[in-house]
Amino acid sequence: MDAGGAGPFGAIGHVGDGGSARDGSGWDPPPGSSAGPCSDVTHHIYLVSPSQELFSFHPAGLELHRIGRLRCGDGGPFSMAVDRNGVAWIVDWNGPVSRVDIATGRCETTPYKVEDGAPFRNFGMAFAADDGPDQETLYVRDAVFFNDTDGANPARTLGVFDRRSYAVRPLGQGAGANADLTGTGDGRLFGFVKQSGASFVSEFDKLTGATLSERALPGVTIGSSWAFATWGGAFWFFVTNDEDALSSRVYRLDPDSQAPPELVMPVLLTAVIGAGVSTCAPTEVPH
């Protein structure tokens, strides 16, 4: 995410000229890729920088591995999610959504189109598990910029990104300003919210978009970009260091503890604007 209302509008985005809709949930990485349904590479956190560099981050050892530079989109990444097949979905600042093989960095642009100024041109995004086995849904939460109407009680709309029709179906609004999203293998959806100089982690209702809970994050100051993911039963927050825009701070939060977020890496050697983790990621730290 970069620091850069509810209504009865219909689905947003469509299949554009020059491309036909396929079952997006079945888009597979290319032959020779090590990605695949819940393969080993889907068990990490993936990061994308403002300069389109793709990385894998291994929380157990605090290791960062560069995969390569992406060649999709022309406005720079805005947010990212990763599915169970090892495909990253990245929304661009200019609105397009691309799919990326997380093992190789190969990418292609989807037909998703939204006009400038329309809802869901930019959004936080994440997959969360469904009730059925091996099923998941891509959730997106609208991001609003240069909006003087937020006041003291901002709200944003949650939607579902349909990977067959390349359209967003709005669900409803929840309290809180712009947020990056992360989902869990047990079906919950959370947001890392920046609001009025403070930061929060919130849980959202996947049916209505309502904010179910909110927890302040003392000591976590969001600058020009931020992202987060869940791994090993904890939340991992990535916040760009504004005094050095080429690096980030990494915080870890145990949701079952009342302790504040722990700064685990003062300097991660990349700025981070998007983070994604699949619903295959471990819910406990592997031994």
Where are these regions (language model features)?
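Repeated scaffold domains used in trafficking and secretory/extracellular systems
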Residues: A35-P37, D74-N85, D116-D130, Q173-D186, ...
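Blade-level signature of beta-propeller repeat domains, shared across WD40, Kelch, NHL, RCC1
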Residues: S247-H287
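Ser/Thr-rich, Pro/Gly/Ala-heavy low-complexity intrinsically disordered linkers and tails
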Residues: M1-C38, P286-H287
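A short beta-strand motif characteristic of beta-propeller blades
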Residues: E63-C72, R106-D116, S165-Q173, A210-G219, ...
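An edge-strand/N-cap motif at the start of beta-rich repeat modules
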Residues: A35-R66
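Structural motif
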Residues: S51-S56, G95-D101, F146-V160, G197-E203, ...
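Conserved beta-propeller blade signature
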Residues: H44-V48, G86-V91, P133-R141, R188-F192, ...
